[in-house]
From Swiss-Prot:
Keyword GTP-binding (UniProt): no
Swiss-Prot/TrEMBL catalytic activity: guanosine(527) in 16S rRNA + S-adenosyl-L-methionine = N(7)-methylguanosine(527) in 16S rRNA + S-adenosyl-L-homocysteine
Family listed: Belongs to the methyltransferase superfamily. RNA methyltransferase RsmG family.
GO molecular function: rRNA (guanine-N7-)-methyltransferase activity
Location of the protein in the cell: Cytoplasm
Function: Specifically methylates the N7 position of guanine in position 527 of 16S rRNA.
UniProtKB keywords: Cytoplasm, Methyltransferase, rRNA processing, S-adenosyl-L-methionine, Transferase
Lineage: superkingdom: Bacteria
GO cellular component annotations of the record: cytosol
Binding site for S-adenosyl-L-methionine: 92, 97, 143-144, 162
Protein name: Ribosomal RNA small subunit methyltransferase G
Pfam family, one: GidB
EC number(s) per entry: 2.1.1.170
Length: 231
């Protein structure tokens, strides 16, 4: 009799919590019990809504935690160096990454999520409500059309994206939203040397950080771009 292939069991919340705790410790990110709980609740929301809204190609909650949550947490020590209070815009946020993770891990920050797809904004608003994130806001529309003081409250200390667009395009589209002293941060896989070579005038790489994400065997880089007009 041929044995039927069994589907891998879905990881329990306890298993995910252990993975999250170990990963956050390895990244040097201090999380309270409430913050860990909120991140696990966020994974559950992603898994639930993903079936209908196709927010991510990753279906397994364990891989969601590694490839989305820990990946996003890996930038917290670098962005958090700005201080306990800052404003951030997550461009092309999709399912809320990395913005929702930043809002949970950096509760003193005011984080705005931006996407052009209404159903993704709907999920982001649902997550904001269910996770009780008072420091999170959502705006739908193309980033290049957003007006400080009208569509968004003002300019931002940090503008970040995760696999949103070519680095040069990202900078061109979002630079009008950078506050004085602020910068643009791009989460990338392999080192994007060709994209860096296409940066527009008045933009330059301030730092490029090689990231190591626990349990993830993949190359990751975080690029900070500074602008002449924001110095």
């Amino acid at each position: 009799m041929t044995a039927q292939r069994r589907q891998a069991p879905i990881a329990s919340r306890e298993t995910l919590q252990a993975l999250l705790s170990e990963g956050a410790e390895a990244l040097g990110v201090a999380l309270s019990d409430a913050q860990r709980g909120a991140l696990l609740d966020y994974v559950a929301l992603l898994a639930k809504w993903n079936a209908v809204y196709n927010l991510t190609a990753i279906r397994d909650p364990r891989q969601m935690l590694i490839q989305h949550i820990l990946d996003s947490l890996s930038i917290v020590p670098h962005l958090g160096a700005r201080g306990a209070a800052a404003t951030a815009l997550d461009v092309g946020s999709g399912g809320g990454l990395p913005g929702i993770v930043l809002a949970i891990a950096l509760p003193g920050w005011q984080v705005t999520l931006n996407d052009i797809v209404q159903k993704k904004s709907a999920f982001q608003n649902q997550a904001k409500a269910e996770l009780k994130l008072g420091n999170l806001s959502v705006v739908t529309g193309r980033v290049e059309t957003l007006r400080p003081g009208a569509d968004v409250q003002g300019k931002f200390d940090v503008i970040v994206s995760r696999a949103f667009a070519d680095l040069a395009d990202f900078v061109t589209l979002a630079r009008h939203l950078v506050a004085p002293g602020g910068s643009i941060w791009a989460m990338k896989g392999v080192r994007p040397d060709e994209e860096i070579g296409r940066l527009p005038d008045g933009a330059r790489v301030k730092q490029m950080i090689r990231l190591t994400v626990p349990s993830l065997d993949a190359e990751r880089h975080l690029i900070e771009v500074e602008l002449d007009e924001a110095i």
